[in-house]
């Protein structure tokens, strides 16, 4: 089918593409907002479909829709949720701040699909019964972010943590020079270093799971301004129950819809925890880049898997591409969080009016963090190789090992020994034999790098 057809809404008639499943209100939004070409993500459209299906079931149970109407709406809404009609959601993300255009887009598409199947329903009077864009869109943010986090991000973080822990066990007895301020410090094992990364990821995951408890609370039922006008008082809880049946996630009605519509504090909180995860990933990525630096003029402690040529002009150069990608994702997520923080402040009186931006940034952050966490695990951490010769050479020349002699020879003599070793570029063991009066056997015991990674007071 080609050409155009005439649709109408409360503002009058409008031309709509002949093969479009949407109607006049969606077309007006397409015409009004040719801004970025960015659309609300697939996960958001999925959530909208699930909400409309749940609302139809709730309204059937409460006696506001006939069985045939509810069944037709549910079938069409679930098809939307399944991704069959994503092309019918063309509205730019930079639109009305309530997301009304996208809510009506869903209502029109679902009504059109129901009509094609033989049941005539109205976008507003039936598909949107008991609802407002002002509670549907915030609910869709909560549902979409919760589902994506549970299905993609949390499993990816679990995989990353497990991968780091496996490498930490493998390298638990391989000592290396520790560093503070990027300067040589007392030794640690690779296993200890990686255990810190694993703990960071575990803590980040726990924080995200805690924030998701609030995201499972839904403002559906608040309708226009939070009072629930034109909705059955039981509607919000009924929708939450139906969503639980559809997704397996224990959604519940928010005690105060006013909170969930006028503010987006739960989304702001979740975004903040995503930013914390991004900071942790940036730290891990930078550590890997430093450890891999070289191979001759850098630290050269590890060799990351070679994934692709690194230069169009320098033959043989290989770069740490995965850690670099991780760092860029982290920067993006931190920027997304800044946008969400500003958007979260835009809840003037009874409604936040930057909801589409919050949805876009939040879902992008969750998605790219999930993807890059798996890449970091599988293409960097699982496969890096330790350059033991380089690591051991640096340990032998590390004058800071003299710290272990402090309880025996005192700080000042230790400092003098360290300075002499550094100045002469000699192993600390050789210099200590000359300056401390300790035997070689005593020094070998006191300066054993692996023993020094176990903490405690040496020399007792």
Predicted regions and their residues:
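Conserved, well-structured ligand/cofactor-binding cores
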Residues: 1-460
């Amino acid at each position: 089918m080609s050409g155009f057809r005439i649709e109408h809404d409360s503002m009058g008639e409008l031309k709509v593409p002949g093969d479009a499943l949407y109607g006049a209100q969606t077309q007006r939004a397409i015409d009004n907002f040719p801004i970025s070409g960015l659309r609300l993500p697939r996960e958001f459209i999925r959530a909208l479909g699930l909400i409309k299906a749940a609302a139809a079931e709730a309204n059937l149970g409460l006696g506001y829709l006939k069985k045939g109407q509810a069944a037709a709406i549910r079938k069409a809404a679930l098809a939307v949720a399944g991704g069959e009609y994503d092309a019918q959601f063309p509205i730019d993300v930079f639109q009305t701040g309530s997301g009304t255009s996208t809510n009506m887009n869903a209502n029109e598409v679902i009504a059109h699909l129901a009509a094609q199947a033989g049941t005539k329903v109205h976008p507003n009077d039936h598909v949107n019964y008991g609802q407002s864009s002002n509670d549907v869109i915030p609910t869709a943010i909560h549902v979409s972010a919760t589902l994506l986090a549970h299905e993609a991000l949390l499993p990816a973080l679990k995989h990353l943590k497990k991968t780091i822990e496996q490498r930490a066990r493998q390298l638990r007895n391989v000592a290396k020079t520790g560093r503070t301020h990027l300067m040589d410090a007392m030794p640690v094992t690779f296993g200890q270093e990686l255990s810190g990364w694993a703990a960071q990821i575990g803590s980040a995951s726990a924080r995200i799971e805690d924030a998701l408890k609030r995201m499972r609370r839904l403002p559906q039922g608040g309708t226009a301004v939070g009072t629930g006008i034109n909705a059955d008082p039981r509607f919000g809880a009924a929708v939450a129950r139906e969503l639980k049946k559809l997704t397996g996630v224990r959604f519940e009605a928010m005690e105060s819809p006013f909170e969930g519509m006028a503010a987006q504090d739960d989304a702001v909180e979740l975004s903040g925890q995503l930013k914390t995860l991004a900071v942790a990933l940036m730290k891990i990525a930078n550590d890997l880049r430093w450890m891999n630096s070289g191979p001759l003029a850098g630290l050269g402690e590890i060799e990351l898997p070679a994934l692709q040529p690194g230069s169009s002009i320098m033959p043989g150069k290989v770069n740490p591409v995965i850690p670099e990608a991780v760092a860029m994702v982290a920067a993006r997520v931190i920027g997304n969080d800044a946008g969400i923080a500003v958007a979260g402040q835009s809840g003037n009186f009874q409604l936040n009016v930057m909801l589409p931006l919050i949805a876009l940034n939040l879902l992008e952050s969750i998605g790219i963090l999930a993807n890059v966490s798996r890449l970091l695990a599988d293409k960097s951490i699982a496969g890096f190789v330790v350059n033991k010769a380089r690591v051991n050479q640096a340990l032998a020349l590390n004058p800071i090992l003299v710290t272990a002699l402090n309880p025996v020879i005192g700080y000042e003599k230790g400092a003098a020994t360290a300075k002499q070793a550094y100045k002469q570029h000699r192993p600390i063991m050789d210099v200590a034999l000359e300056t401390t009066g300790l035997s070689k056997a005593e020094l070998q015991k006191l300066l054993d790098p692996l023993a020094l990674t176990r903490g405690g007071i040496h020399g007792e």
